[in-house]
Structure formats: structure tokens, C-alpha cells
Amino acid sequence: MEKNAAAEIATTADKTRLISPFAETVGSLAVEAMLYEVTCTPSPGLVDRVNSGAHTDMDFYSFMSSSAALSICMTRCVQAGLNHGGTLPALLPVLRRIGIDGEARMLQATGGVNTQKGLLFSLGIVAAAVGWLQHTRNRQDSGSILQCVAAMTAGIVTRELGNMDKSVTSLTAGEKLYRLHGVTGIRGEMEQGLPAVLEHGLPTLRQAMADHLTVNSALLQTLLVLMTVVDDTTVMNRHHP
């Protein structure tokens, strides 16, 4: 049964290689968001145009390379949502399959450096939610999109972090922080429907743009607000909590 299920997931993921114009449009917006993130300068503790922050193995150009490599993956995530006729939790294994391919592309582009695996996970799921809403309801708004994200990832913290039997030395950074400090990281944010984005990030960004700030200033203001409410496990790990 598991073998058949895996084959079905692989077939479903492969179907996303046939891309619709809608998926191309949303996928390009996802890549634009990825590029905007790294061009926001200064970004304390993070990679930006002039500094690598807490990172010693990557820089601005690493992110340019990986963003380009992940572009097709983002489009395929949108297409996966458009194609999906089942429940939202059933879409997640398909996205994981696409994500594995995306991660391989990213690592090849960066010489083996993990620049945007977390963003591949989070933004890929958001992109798929947009596709699913277009297919099922012909609508997209931030609240509905993030409700879909929560439904798609329901129970992910317990499944992936709550039942670990690994030794501490074999844990990933996120797993170690959860075991030692109870930090749920991006999985917890996704399972809750990215509340920091909905309640803090988006209102701040929209107000900044309404106040006619430059794009960089608006992004920086949004970043600083998010830093007050989000636990960044990457920065926490690289600064040895």
C-alpha cells in the first residue's frame, strides 16, 4: 500500500510540470518575494546586499543563484494546488516531492549551501494554497490563503518534532531547538496559519506602502516588526543558543 501511495504521489507531482499561465504568474510573484527578501538592507542577522549577518557560508549572490534555481519549483507548487482535488492535508506530500527536487536544484546552484530551504517550505506551501483557492473558489485573499496553509499543515509539529527518537547529535537545528527550548519554528508558524504575517507583517507592510515609503524602507520596517514576534531558528542556531 505504501509503495502504491508513493508512486501515486510521484505521478501527481510530475503532472505539475505542465504549467498553466496562472501558475506562471503566481510563481513569478513568489520569486519576486524571494528576491525582495534578500535585497532588503540592512537586515540584522540576515543576508542582505552588503552583509552576511549570522551566516558565514553564503552571501547576497548565493541567494540570487538559489532564487533563480527555485523559480520552477514555486511555479510547480502553484500548479499542484490548481491540480489538487482532494483534501488540503493530502496536498502536502505532493509538495514535499516537489520540494525535494527544488532542494537539489538549490544545492547545485549554491555549491551545496542551504540558503533557502525554509523559504522553499513555507513559500511553496503558500503558493500551493493560492493555486488551490483559485481551483476551488476562484478567489485569493490573505486570510483565506493562510487558513489553507493552516489546514494543509495541521499536526505537523507533533508529527515531525513531537515524536523524535534521535540522539541530540543527529538532530537538525530546528529539531534541536524544539527539544531543548520548545521552539516550534516555521512548522509552528505554518500550523497556526502564519499569524505573525497576518497580524503583524502584512498590516505593517501595507501601511508603510500607503505612507509612500520606499520599497526598501517598507520591507525593513516590516522585518523589524516581525523580528519582535517571530523566533528565527536559523539565527538562533547560528548564534549558538
Task: Give each language-model segment a name.
Residues 1-85, 92, 130-241:
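Phosphate-rich cofactor/ligand-interacting catalytic cores and adjacent structured alpha/beta frameworks
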Residues 74-132:
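Long, hydrophobic/aromatic-enriched structural stretches that serve as scaffold segments
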